[in-house]
Regions:
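HIT superfamily nucleotide-processing domains
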Residues: 1-132
């Protein structure tokens, strides 16, 4: 994971608060959380985005997502749902060019209208009417 020739934040900084890890990935609570217990799941190998992950890395990351989810539900009984997402590319909002997946706990009332969930990345597309 550490490479002195790579300036990547996730490869070289001293990551504090590693919640869990396995051979291929680790989970760390976000320094700038959207909500309490917002967690990042990060592959140990330096890859730019989700589409570069191997099948084994995808499984390792998903395993950590499940572990962290259960841990959060034990810590905070008010968590009722989650958003899971990754930004792949600068135009999609990726600011650290090392793949990472956000696990964001959601609580009832944390936003006025949660309809559309991750669709809110483009605000005018967040709210919609079902055709069925």
């Amino acid at each position: 994971m550490r490479d002195p020739n790579n300036p990547c934040l996730f490869c070289n900084s001293k990551i504090s608060g590693i919640a869990h890890e396995n051979d291929l990935a680790y989970a760390s609570y976000d320094t700038y959380p959207v909500s309490e217990f917002h967690c990042l799941i990060i592959p140990k190998r330096h890859v730019i985005d989700y589409f570069e992950l191997t099948d084994e890395e995808l499984v390792a990351c998903n395993d950590l997502i499940k572990v962290i989810k259960e841990e959060i539900l034990i810590k905070d009984k008010n968590v009722k749902a989650f958003n899971i997402g990754t930004n792949a590319g600068k135009i999609a909002g990726q600011s650290i060019m090392h793949c990472h997946t956000h696990l964001i706990p959601r609580r009832e009332g944390d936003v006025e209208n949660p309809q559309g969930g991750v669709r809110s990345v483009i605000p005018q597309k967040q709210h919609y009417k079902r055709k069925i």
